[in-house]
Amino acid sequence: MTATLERRESASLWERFCSWITSTENRLYIGWFGVLMIPTLLTATTVFIIAFIAAPPVDIDGIREPVAGSLLYGNNIITGAVIPSSASIGIHFYPIWEAASLDEWLYNGGPYQLIVDHFLLGVCGWIGREWEFSYRLGMRPWISVAFTAPVAAASAVFLVYPIGQGSFSDGMPLGISGTFNFMLVFQAEHNILMHPFHQLGVAGVFGGSLFSAMHGSLVTSSLIRETTENESANYGYKFGQEEETYNIVAAHGYFGRLIFQYASFNNSRALHFFLGLWPVVGIWFTALGIMTMAFNLNGFNFNQSVVDSQGRVINTWADILNRANLGIEVMHERNAHNFPLDLASGESLPVALTAPAVIG
């Protein structure tokens, strides 16, 4: 008998890199989308931390009145933010090399664009990485589909809305109070509370929280006990077991009698599909609503007040909401314009003496 020994060809450095990148045995899966995700998210995180701590004031309104957002310039964790790019930049791409100097780039809010652009690329890479990992494990792709909802929401407030409004200065500041300021101004300018897509988003988020709490409490209340009374019920289960952990029939029967029969699910797959679908679709609609309002397709405006036969105003909640919107609009960007256009366009009325009808 003759034994033939062949010399094993060593894989090239590129082949070994490809094998390592796509291996599902790594402690953290990287994948080809991870090659995009990791550097972009690291860049966004690093620049955000530096800018939040030490960035100089930014001329956000383009009127040579810089606004300080960093900790070293007098802010705290609540008031601090990375200030959006200047209105003088508009929606132009503004990398470091487009500025005459680093000081000019910082003064015009360049870090905001750098952070937002890298962050959006990074979270898109995260979606792709979730799909890629699921594909290599033979799983279905719904995890990545669900994550498109928060990515759509982030894209709406950081990219689509500024483009629609004509300037990245209208984007959401990267900070706690800056986020609240963005929400208030958005309400004043677009009446988002009266937009049906935002209302669907509220139903999605609050409904998803309710359904999650209901499902979790029903499951933990109907566990199938595999241990004695002297042992913890947790010892009766192991990860990946074939047997069911809880009794869905008991949970279904309880909930069906608590509310009514058809309010509960008797199919586990349908139940969990619904639990995933409800909040995701709600957030999709919210993101779509932000994108439509970016181009000034706003929420419902009931601008014509209800009046009686004598012409006197009958105050409704719509009147209160309109007044609140006008008040917020007067307060924001107070130095950028002398008076909001929708207040300056009508005839001057003695507001302190009468309650005028709000006419759009």
UniProtKB/Swiss-Prot annotation:
Gene Ontology MF terms: chlorophyll binding; electron transporter, transferring electrons within the cyclic electron transport pathway of photosynthesis activity; iron ion binding; oxidoreductase activity, acting on diphenols and related substances as donors, oxygen as acceptor
TM regions (residue ranges): 29-46, 118-133, 142-156, 197-218, 274-288
Protein location: Plastid, Chloroplast thylakoid membrane
The keyword Heme is assigned to this record: no
Keyword entries, A-Z: Calcium, Chlorophyll, Chloroplast, Chromophore, Electron transport, Herbicide resistance, Iron, Magnesium, Manganese, Membrane, Metal-binding, Oxidoreductase, Photosynthesis, Photosystem II, Plastid, Thylakoid, Transmembrane, Transmembrane helix, Transport
UniProt binding sites for pheophytin a: 126
Residues binding [CaMn4O5] cluster: 170, 189, 332-333, 342, 344
Positions bearing the site annotation: Tyrosine radical intermediate: 161
Residue positions assigned to the propeptide: 345-360
GO biological process, one term: response to herbicide
Pfam families assigned: Photo_RC
Site label Cleavage, positions: 344-345
EC number(s) given by UniProt: 1.10.3.9
Top class in the EC scheme: oxidoreductase
Note: 2 of the reaction center chlorophylls (ChlD1 and ChlD2) are entirely coordinated by water.
Protein name: Photosystem II protein D1
Gene: psbA
